Amino acid sequence: MEKKAKLMIVAGESSGELYGSLIAHYLKNDFDLIGIGGKYMADAGVKLIGEVTHAFGAFEAISKIKKLKENMKKANEALQNVEGVILIDFPDFNLNLAQKAKKLGKKVLYYVSPQIWAWRKKRIKKIKKVVDFMAVVLPFEEEIYKKEKIPVEFVGHPMFEVMKQELGLYIKNESLSLDNKRHIRDKFGIKKETVITLMPGSRPSEIKRKIPLMLNLVEKFDKSKTHFIIPKAPNIDLSEQFLKQITTKENVTVLNEKSFIALAMSDVAVITSGTSTLQSAIVQTPMIVVYRLSPLSYLIGKTIIKGVKHIALPNVIADFMNLDDVRIPEFIQKLDAEEIAEEINKMLYDEYYREKIITFLGNIKRYFTEKEASREVYKICKKLFC
């Protein structure tokens, strides 16, 4: 029996670890797999040599630095005995590892591109030197790498796979249509006429800055008709202070489910910028993006982030792909509950405006429904590593 080639999959965060597990399900029959990840990857057949870290506070950050050094040491040692590496996001760590892999003559596949289109654009020069193939998850990224003559393919986004699999538990089929909202609400006993999801972020610092806004928004709507959902996935650290204040409201549910379950049953969502904006686009739930940094962080961000007009991923995609559509409203730094409540009401009750937003989200969604990212990455691996 022919010995299988050995590959190393390296993820640095919980999302990357999940994406790594999805491709491992395809790869495990053709390759021996080792890697840095977590439970998802281990369950998918990857022999772990290191684990991802989850750090929020200052003390945890010190622990994280130590863990990263340990993981880099283990990964460097493992490089000697693998045919190639699959690096998932986490660029500061993974681009350094790619450089070491390249020196050893190992093939390098990079999955989920660094956001070079927004900041630290010069990283593309390093990528060109140390990466053999880029598997990108946003449609406009493909052209960026092609211009630099870097082998690349837009593979779709693995988040769509996850959503399609899990929403099947709550709807009659795997369609992600708007008609399924009522069915999902029934599963959770939510009977109100209007459902709004509030997503204050995943980190304590983000959540702290959004608490006043979220509490004010709840007060601005008729509690007999409107129900608010706050998703609390395992990787979201909602503070005790926030939970105490928000759970006293009779028309608020803190839902211990992944955020896209809440988004799928909602009429409107108020979201901190991030992957959740893409989730909302995929289920075509109109959204408002709210974003607030500390004044210093905002000033630094304005200095280093160049070439993008928006922060919400659906808007960024639309800008790069030159879509002639409406854009999702973004409230940055100035988070006025009155203005945001007005925008929510417009999305709920102005039928023309609501339909324009839903159509726009449908146009974004189409980029992701035609490809299964993990299967596409598997095909690339078969060509690159065999």
Please describe what each predicted stretch is.
Residues 1-386:
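Nucleotide-activated sugar donor-binding and catalytic core shared by glycosyltransferases
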